[in-house]
Design a protein with these regions (language model features):
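Terminal targeting signals and extreme-terminal segments of soluble enzymes
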Residues: 1-264
Length: 264
């Protein structure tokens, strides 16, 4: 079985065209959105090797099937000296399962700098290992006595987890960005369910249909996914069959690396 990091290895039969495979997440067959984001980021980075990925906006109009290969197409909308914008489509045959716009740019020196401090949640060594969330090569520890799968455990619409990928290749910015996208897609629905007794993550893809609709992700800094990062999620709104929230990924030093916003 592929690991998440192995799934980032795309083949390229022609310029702007890539092929990939999927990993199985949970008991269902839909392709996981975090995996698709990583593969989209890898394809975009490979198409403009002189630049780094800065932001991603992605939609998931249809569910993919993990048993079928993925076809990833990159269309360069603009390429300049310091910035490039690409559209990235993911298909399985005639089925269009994802569409993204990716901004790439070059590194610049600081003009001004500030970032929010790391939330006071304790060190990762103090957090509880989350075996049910640690899959495909990741290590995840959840802050507090939180069980996102338990329909009867009620709490605020937020969750914080420490995440690291021990086998992530240090110094490989494209791959570290891509694998870091994985868990930005994984926690918000569970956070949104927490205030509501009788609803929990264990119901997903069984008695309750869940899935990502849109996701926006920005990379502020280079970072190594092999190091611990704190991922915080705040589900600000739930209603009309949708959830909206934001998240932030920060190093242990407090440097914000990746904010994201998602709609389900």
């Amino acid at each position: 079985m592929l690991t998440a990091i192995q799934a980032l290895e795309l083949t390229s039969p022609a310029a702007g065209e890539f092929r990939g495979e999927s990993v199985l997440v949970g008991d269902g067959r839909p392709v996981f959105g975090g995996q698709l984001m990583g593969q989209v980021l890898m394809a975009a980075a490979a198409s403009h090797g002189d630049k780094v990925v800065r932001s991603l906006q992605i939609m998931f109009p249809r569910a993919g099937d993990v048993a079928r290969p993925l076809e990833v197409s990159v269309d360069t909308l603009h390429s300049g000296r310091t910035m490039a914008t690409v559209g990235v489509a993911v298909r399985q045959g005639q089925r269009h399962i994802s569409q993204a716009t990716v901004l790439l740019d070059t590194e610049e020196e600081d003009v001004i700098r500030h970032a929010p401090p790391l939330p006071a949640v304790g060190d990762p060594e103090q957090a509880k290992p989350a075996e049910n969330l640690s899959h495909h090569g990741a290590e995840v520890r959840i802050v507090g006595n939180v069980d996102l799968g338990d329909p009867e455990q009620v709490g605020p619409p937020e969750v914080a987890v420490w995440v690291r990928w021990p086998d992530a290749p240090r110094g490989d910015r494209a791959r570290n960005h891509a694998i870091s996208a994985w868990y930005t897609d994984n926690m918000l629905i569970g956070a949104a369910m927490r205030p509501h007794a009788g609803v929990g993550g264990s119901m997903a893809h069984a008695s309750l249909s869940t899935g990502v609709v849109t996701h926006t992700l920005t990379f502020h800094e280079a970072s190594d996914a092999a190091d611990w990062h704190l991922l915080t999620n705040d589900a600000a709104y739930a209603g009309r069959g949708r959830v909206y929230g934001t998240g932030r990924s920060s190093r242990r030093t407090g440097l914000s690396c990746r904010p994201s916003a998602r709609t389900r």
